Each structure stands twice: as C-alpha cells, then as structure tokens.
C-alpha cells in the first residue's frame, strides 16, 4: 500500500494493520504478556510480523501466515496458512517456542487446541486508532522482551502519525477511498468500516467510500456507483492481489472518478 508509505510512513502502516498478539503459557493458561524463549517464533498477522522485523527480531521467526508478506524476508519463512483458517498441526509442526497470534485469527477450535498446548501464546486486542497503533507496538515489544526498542519505534511512529494528522487536517474535501480486497471473476469485495484498511484510510486523511456495513462484503454495481471513489486502493501482493488493468475492465469502476483519472494504487 504505497499511498500509506507516502503519507504516514511504512511504520505507521504496519502498526495500523496490526491485529493482536496472544501467547498461551501453560497447558490451561490463556495468554501471557511475555515469552520466555523467543528463539523459534510463529507470527500470525501481517502487521505483527512487520513489527517483529521493525524491532530487529526477524531472525527469531521460523514461520508466518499468508498475510505476512512484508518485508521480503518474511516470504521465505514456513507458511502455516491463512490466519482465519489455521490448523493447529500446521502451527505446531515447526516446534515453536512462542506464537504471536493476531486477534481475529481462527477458527475457534484451532485457538482452543493452541491454548491447551505447552507453547506460550500472547493476544493483543484488534483496533485501528492512532492510540492503539502505539499500544500494539509496545505490547509486541514487551512480548519479545524488547521494550526499549519498542519505545523508540513507537516514538517514531507517533511522530509519523502526528505529521499525517496535520496533513489530513488541510485536505478539504477529503478523498473518498475504496479499498478492494479482491476482484475474483469480476466480483468486487471491498472494505466497510471496522477494518484495518478503514483505519489506514482514516489515518492517511481519507474517507472510506463504503460506510454502510462493517468488515468485508461483495459489492453490487449499484453500490460501487454510489461509492463514487476518488481513489481505489488494492492489494498489491499475495493471493488476493488485484491488477489495475483488471479493475478497469469493470465498466462501473472504469467510469468512477478514480477510474476516469487512473487513480488506483496498489
């Protein structure tokens, strides 16, 4: 999402997208705040993985989920599957000493098995406000025993966010942004409110063009036309990557303000 990098910096973007991290300690424990042995970690959640690398602890990771595609080194790690369709066997197959688990991961039965295992897990609540960005960095840092580095990173991101807020305060009217998660077979799945994408749009000074629902849903042509986005933001990497040329084959998107101006960012 290069538009975010230009507005608030890569650090802020990764933190906004971060969901929560949870480590389950003993056999019947739910979560812990700090992992004693961080030598072999599994990270589930793209932003959590980015934070780990930003803290200089990427060498501790042995596996990641499919949403963890940045930085490039992360893609070389063992892939344990999509964060919402994890299998306990896949996660535990790499013999982790700790699991960084984003809130929203699942399914529930997998989480129950992981919590009953002897591998520590830590859960960080998923939120997308400026305040929660800083809290997530600090919580990941605490989980890894890297509090000082986390404090420094949080300070950098805080400055980026303040800069972004100053920039966005001068934007009038604010750009209407449509985040498209996928466009498989011409069917547009886009972000409503209550998502990491919505949080990024807001922090970057934009307005989500879709505010009629929470989460991700398929849009009708009428809904796309009504959204009238000034900017279309899409996935640039991974299995859900969407190409600009493919989007412009959709006549409704092509005729939108973003389509007419070619204002499509991956």
Question: What residues fall within each predicted segment?
Answer:
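A ligand-binding cleft/hinge motif common to bilobed small-molecule-binding domains
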Residues: 105-116, 234-250
């Amino acid at each position: 999402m290069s538009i975010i990098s230009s507005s608030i910096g890569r650090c802020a973007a990764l933190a906004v997208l971060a969901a929560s991290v949870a480590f389950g300690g003993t056999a019947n424990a739910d979560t812990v705040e700090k992992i004693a042995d961080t030598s072999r970690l599994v990270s589930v959640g793209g932003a959590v993985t980015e934070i780990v690398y930003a803290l200089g602890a990427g060498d501790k990771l042995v596996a990641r989920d499919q949403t963890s595609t940045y930085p490039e080194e992360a893609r070389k790690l063992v892939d344990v599957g999509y964060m919402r369709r994890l299998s306990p066997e896949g996660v535990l197959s790499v013999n982790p000493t700790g699991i960084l688990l984003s809130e929203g991961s699942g399914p529930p039965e997998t989480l129950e098995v992981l919590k009953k295992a002897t591998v520590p897990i830590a859960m960080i609540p998923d939120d997308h406000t400026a305040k929660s960005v800083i809290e997530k960095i600090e919580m990941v840092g605490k989980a890894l025993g890297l509090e000082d580095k986390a404090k420094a990173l949080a300070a950098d991101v805080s400055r980026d966010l303040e800069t972004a807020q100053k920039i966005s305060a001068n934007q009038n009217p604010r750009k209407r942004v449509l985040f498209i998660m996928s466009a498989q077979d011409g069917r547009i799945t886009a972000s409503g409110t209550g998502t990491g994408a919505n949080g990024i749009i807001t922090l970057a000074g934009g307005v989500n063009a879709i505010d009629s629902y929470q989460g991700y849903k398929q849009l009708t042509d009428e809904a796309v036309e009504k959204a009238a986005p000034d900017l279309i933001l899409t996935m640039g990497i991974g299995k859900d990557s969407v190409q600009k040329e493919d989007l412009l084959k959709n006549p409704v998107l092509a005729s939108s303000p973003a389509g007419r101006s070619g204002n499509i960012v991956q």
